[in-house]
């Protein structure tokens, strides 16, 4: 039984590779919080979390001042026990972003540590359900892009083997969204998935109106049409449209997902590994969705995000429209520690008290 003795924390700001504009904001920075745990046997595990430009230093402070002092000295194999202990330890601070993002950094590091110790890739020790998953692209679908650019990107994505594209909607007039989606459907045909993402921009009535206007285009889903805390609105929308409603990236607890699933307020669950608090609760949500016969399409899957290219040397393998699960032990990420040290705005170390 090897106990956790030492932790290193880095916060690295990463600029987006392309300009990103949706219905509510423009992305300017990804604050990446990287946590490296060392156990008494000399083994290490690295996890990470992220923010969209705000709050990264608060996540670091919660880790350094409260969570890591409680973690150090624990048996690194007790992942479930550690997650539950830290979850309830922080419960009084409220279930939400800062707490969940900090928990995720610890939890993913522990999974990486365990997988590395047994010499297996993460997807194997998490159950090994699939060795590859179909992929779609969002990078050409931002709201500021002209219609012609959306069509060109969709053509390239289809030629490259992607299974679909997702674009942002939320133009001032419904007719603009309809024109853009219609142009895409005509360009790629009916054998290619199209999804739309609203980024919580609409009222209930506006979302219902836009869903009806887009119904003819056989959409794979309409994502985050309403504010995430509007459960009743999602119930109304789900009952009024044939388009599958996707939610989850802005839900921060298992209980929130339970409510959506019990009320049949969504058809696609997009649980985010960082925002839910790590791999441990992510798996709980995925299995809960399975019990309701609801599909899972993960949001912002942590090891896939292209911005990490600046601080990693490994790359995801995509072949014939499928992302192949990494086969190396752990998360499958080769971190560039020199780049991390060079780019980090915050670097801290926490050791177990003597």
Model-inferred region functions:
Residues 42, 67, 106, 119, ...:
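Conserved, mostly hydrophobic/aromatic
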Residues 33-40, 314-318:
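Short beta-strand elements
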């Amino acid at each position: 039984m090897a106990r956790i003795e030492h932790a290193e924390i880095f916060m690295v700001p990463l600029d987006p590779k392309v300009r990103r504009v949706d219905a509510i904001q423009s992305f300017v920075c990804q604050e990446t919080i990287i946590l490296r745990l060392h156990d008494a046997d000399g083994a290490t595990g690295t996890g990470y979390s992220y923010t969209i430009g705000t709050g990264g230093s608060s996540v670091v402070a919660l880790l350094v001042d409260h969570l890591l002092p409680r973690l150090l000295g624990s048996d690194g194999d007790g992942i479930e026990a550690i997650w539950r202990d830290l979850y309830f330890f922080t419960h009084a601070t409220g279930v939400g972003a800062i707490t969940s993002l900090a928990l995720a950094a610890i939890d993913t590091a522990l999974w990486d540590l365990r997988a590395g110790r047994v010499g297996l890739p993460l997807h194997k020790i998490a159950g090994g359900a699939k060795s590859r998953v179909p992929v779609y692209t969002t990078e050409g679908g931002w709201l500021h892009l002209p219609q012609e650019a959306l069509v060109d990107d969709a053509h390239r994505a289809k030629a490259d083997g992607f299974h679909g594209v997702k674009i942002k909607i939320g133009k001032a007039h419904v007719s603009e969204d309809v024109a853009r989606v219609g142009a895409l459907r005509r360009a790629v045909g009916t054998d290619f998935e199209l999804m739309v993402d609203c980024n919580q921009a609409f009222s209930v009535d506006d979302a219902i109106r836009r869903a009806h206007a887009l119904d003819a285009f056989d959409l794979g889903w309409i994502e985050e049409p309403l504010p995430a805390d509007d459960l009743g609105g999602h119930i109304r929308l789900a009952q009024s449209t044939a388009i599958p409603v996707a939610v989850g990236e802005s839900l921060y607890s298992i209980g929130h997902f339970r409510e959506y699933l019990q009320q049949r307020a969504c058809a696609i669950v997009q649980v985010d590994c960082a925002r839910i608090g790590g791999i441990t609760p992510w798996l709980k949500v995925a299995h809960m969705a399975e019990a309701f016969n609801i599909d899972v399409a993960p949001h912002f899957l942590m090891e896939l995000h292209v911005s990490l290219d600046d601080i990693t040397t490994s790359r995801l393998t995509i072949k014939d429209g499928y992302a192949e699960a990494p086969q190396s032990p752990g998360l499958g990420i080769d971190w560039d520690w020199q780049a991390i040290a060079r780019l980090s705005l915050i670097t801290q170390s926490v050791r177990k008290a003597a």
